[in-house]
Regions:
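Acidic/proline-rich low-complexity IDRs
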Residues: 1, 82-85, 108
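A generic structural signal for alpha->beta connector loops
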Residues: 1-3, 11, 71, 95-96
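STAS-typified acidic loop motif
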Residues: 2-31
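General small-molecule cofactor/ligand-binding pocket signal
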Residues: 5-7, 77, 99
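Conserved catalytic submotifs in the C-terminal HATPase_c
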Residues: 9-11, 47, 103
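Residues within well-formed alpha-helices
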Residues: 16, 62, 66, 104-107
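Amphipathic alpha-helical interaction surfaces in cytosolic regulatory modules
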Residues: 23-96
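A charged, well-structured terminal subsegment
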Residues: 100-115
Length: 115
């Protein structure tokens, strides 16, 4: 089961999925991210996601595409070594800033040199 919380903060929206992000839960995540399409800056906190497969990664990439089409941007906060390794191995961290803390990810939002 995947739970998703959305918090609106000054300057960005925090999307925090909690639970496995995989083929079984990806539709719920896609829907949540699609609901944020009008937001300028989105920070996705993956710290509560113990597992993510290619479906979850694809949903993240789709959210990035939509945000950038609307002149926005996305950053990811994640302190889980297994997910950081996945994001690095797939090259995801070359298109989006991936930082260990929310604070670091917020600083990277909108900074073209942050990736």
């Amino acid at each position: 089961m995947l739970e998703i919380t959305v918090e609106r903060n000054e300057g960005y929206v925090l999307c925090r999925p909690s639970g496995e992000l995989d083929a079984y839960t990806v539709a719920q995540f896609r829907e949540a991210v699609a609901g944020l399409a009008d937001e300028r800056f989105i920070l996705v906190d993956l710290s509560y996601v113990p597992f993510m497969d290619s479906a979850g990664l694809g949903a993240l990439i789709g959210g990035i595409r939509r945000a950038r089409e609307n002149d926005g941007d996305v950053a990811v906060a994640c302190d889980r070594p297994s997910l950081i390794r996945l994001l690095h191995t797939t090259g995801f961290d070359r298109i989006v800033p991936v930082r260990e803390t929310i604070e670091e990810a917020v600083l990277a939002l909108g900074d073209p040199d942050a990736v």
